[in-house]
Amino acid sequence: MQNLLLPFLFLPLLGFTQTNLPGILNIQERAAVIDEILEDRIDNLLPVLMRRTGIDMWVMISREYNEDPVMKTMLPSTWLSARRRTMMVFYDPGEGKELEKIAIARYSVGRLLEGSWDINAYPDQWEALINVIAEKNPNQIGINVSENFALADGLVKTEHEAFLKVLPEKFHPRIVSAEKLAISWLETRSEKELEIYPMICRIGHAILQEGLSEKMIHPGITTTDDVVWWLRNRVNELGLDTWFHPTVSIQRADPESFDHLRTFSKRPDTRYIQFGDLLHVDFGITYLRLNTDQQQHFYVLKPGEKEVPQELQVAFNKSSRLQDILTEQFALSRSGNIVLKRALDQAKSEGLIASIYTHPIGFHGHAAGPTIGLWDQQGGVPGRGDYPLYHNTAYSIELNTSSEIPSWGKVIRIMLEEDGVYTKDGFWYLDGRQEEIFTIPRH
């Protein structure tokens, strides 16, 4: 098969920095890349995951506009939703044999799943599904039901009940939750995805560099909401999507203290940007079915200032150190809760006032995989935090530290978030990370 990802492979050789916007594919080109990646994932990744989790048959059932989140990631680029009732069956006949991909539908699902419903032989769709199950006689039939992971709980009550009603009793003991398989499918990035993910993160960084600059921000005139909507409009102009509404907030030398609850549960108030403000932005895009989630800081230079005040940069460096502390704790099979505890213990030993709330990222912004803290659950997250780390999962390294700023007479928080991936070679940032506070204007 022609490798449609080659144009991306040469981009790192061009000497891009975070200020350069990579070329963005048109819709037809995107569709070709999406389908190439999807075919590769199903043919090469899915069999490995099914064997790892011990499920030899995976059944997914969804109706149009009410799709299972997992099924939605398996639809080809030209399918924007399921059709009527779509049934997907993946069957692993064993080592050395090719994965069987079956659609119990009137038509094939693109080139990926062959339609196998002979309406003359089986007028009822459910009967056709049961025939496939009886013919393959699997040891375990995985269905997407999960108490802890919403993304792995996509089999709705109506379809679940209908399935069990028609399934012969002898197969009922073989029904198992496909939670681990669903999470593995969603969280694991393929080699092809890891080839393009750095460029997707680069696009997000480049948009931030453009929007939080003297081009857009004029102290005393521009509001935080102006910047937010500039970001939304710019994403739209580029033909991209955003999976959440951005935020831009301000910390400055005034009596107002940092409101932890407001920061995480409410949108910041609209404020005019002034000289000497420390701006924080939270922003993410969706492109080629992958998401980004980035938080960075920008300082608006006062007239005559040439650089960021040292005390602010020192505060920033503490959060950078916390990033390192956290990612140094990543280890295969270690749970998110253990990673969280070890990182917070190390941060405390170094005198950092730290908070960690890191999450996987990929097909979804807050994606499947181990949760490493929530902003309001620093003691661990039951269920999602107990899930172990595997290789080739991408993470948004999201956290903050608190620091006293003597000249401001107050405590500030430096909240950072950058996307990276944990592989057998360790953790690395997909497009680097912010290493110092950016100035407005740039120097």
Predicted segments, located by residue:
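Active-site neighborhoods and metal-handling regions in enzymes and metal-associated proteins
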Residues: T19-H443
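Sec-dependent N-terminal signal peptides
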Residues: L4-L14
